[in-house]
Amino acid sequence: MSERTHWRDYLALTKPGVVMLLMVTAVAGMFLATEPAGMVPLATFIPAFVGLSLAMMASAAINQIMDQKIDAIMKRTEKRPLVAGKLTPKAAITFAVLLATASMIMLYFLVNPLTAWLTLFGFVGYAFIYTLYLKRATPQNIVIGGIAGAIPPLLGWTAVTGEAHPYAWLLVLIIFVWTPPHFWALAIHRRDEYAKADIPMLPVTHGIPFTRESVLYYTILLFICTLLPYLTGMSDLIYLLSALILGLVFLYHAVRLRFSEDPKLPMKTFGYSITYLFALFTALLVDHYLPVTPANVASWLGA
């Protein structure tokens, strides 16, 4: 190592920003699994939160271990701790194994076996199947591998209930459909870097115009999917209004990206997609604890 190892290097290895966003969806899954206005018992919440966080941190660390050569080529990732020589591969592997082991033990024995097994599925899917194979094999890498990154709300739900309810799978569907426009917007901006690293991202294999169209199509599909929680009775009017507003803004970004050559638009779309997902799941939680139904509105209006 060229520099003294610092705890921040281990933290950077776990992609804390990504883990934080995923944990927002996992925590949302926990609380949405309760009865309206119900709370998650601390005896469940604490081990589930810690266990899921450790699993996501471990998978992110393994992703960086596997992608070390690729990260060294790309400007966006060239300062990551392994590439910069701040951590040795051996130290990183040991750290990742410890995180993963602690996660599985905690989830299996302190939460429930179903959550542990589903977490293991997501861990293997992202850290190994996506990182080692799909990312390097097909431009549909993030579509096929998206299921692994979309399951946190399901994990949160099963941690509380011990079952994979259809509503939990609906949350998975939303993140699954959100993933392509989110990543492809970034891939458009970083197209040359992916090409240099020989990663077959969609802008590299099919061109930027095709990718712009794909972002728009998936954003339209996402808009439709986000209406399902209301249409199925899972959520009420606060969520519906939020989903409509957030979705229309996302569509605005996607349409501009499709028809404009402004080089700033891909990253603006990428940035908004993160805000969008955070706000959408926040709206789900607010709606769960402050339900506003058409009947409520009619009563308030004196109808």
UniProtKB/Swiss-Prot annotation:
What GO terms fall under cellular component here? Answer: plasma membrane
Q: Does the keyword Secreted apply?
A: no
Which domain of life does the protein's organism represent? Bacteria
Q: In which pathway does it act?
A: Porphyrin-containing compound metabolism; heme O biosynthesis; heme O from protoheme: step 1/1
A Pfam family for this UniProt protein?
UbiA
Topology within the bilayer = Multi-pass membrane protein
Its UniProt entry gives the catalysed reaction(s) as:
heme b + (2E,6E)-farnesyl diphosphate + H2O = Fe(II)-heme o + diphosphate
- Which biological process terms from the Gene Ontology are attached to this UniProt entry? heme O biosynthetic process
Give the chief site where it resides: membrane
Q: Per its UniProt record, what CDD domains does this chain match?
A: PT_UbiA_Cox10 (cd13957)
Any signal peptide, and if so, which residues? Answer: none
GO molecular function list: protoheme IX farnesyltransferase activity
Coiled-coil spans are none
Please give the PROSITE patterns that the UniProt record associates with this protein.
UBIA
User: What are the TM regions of this chain, as residue ranges?
Assistant: 17-37, 42-62, 91-111, 114-134, 142-162, 168-188, 208-228, 231-251, 270-290
Entry's Gene3D superfamilies?
A: UbiA prenyltransferase
The protein's location, in the record's own words, is: Cell inner membrane
The family note in this entry says: Belongs to the UbiA prenyltransferase family. Protoheme IX farnesyltransferase subfamily.
What does the UniProt record say this protein does? Answer: Converts heme B (protoheme IX) to heme O by substitution of the vinyl group on carbon 2 of heme B porphyrin ring with a hydroxyethyl farnesyl side group.
What does the further note read?
Carbon 2 of the heme B porphyrin ring is defined according to the Fischer nomenclature.
Instruction: Write the protein's name.
Output: Protoheme IX farnesyltransferase
Q: Which organism is it from?
A: Alcanivorax borkumensis (strain ATCC 700651 / DSM 11573 / NCIMB 13689 / SK2)
Q: Gene encoding it?
A: cyoE
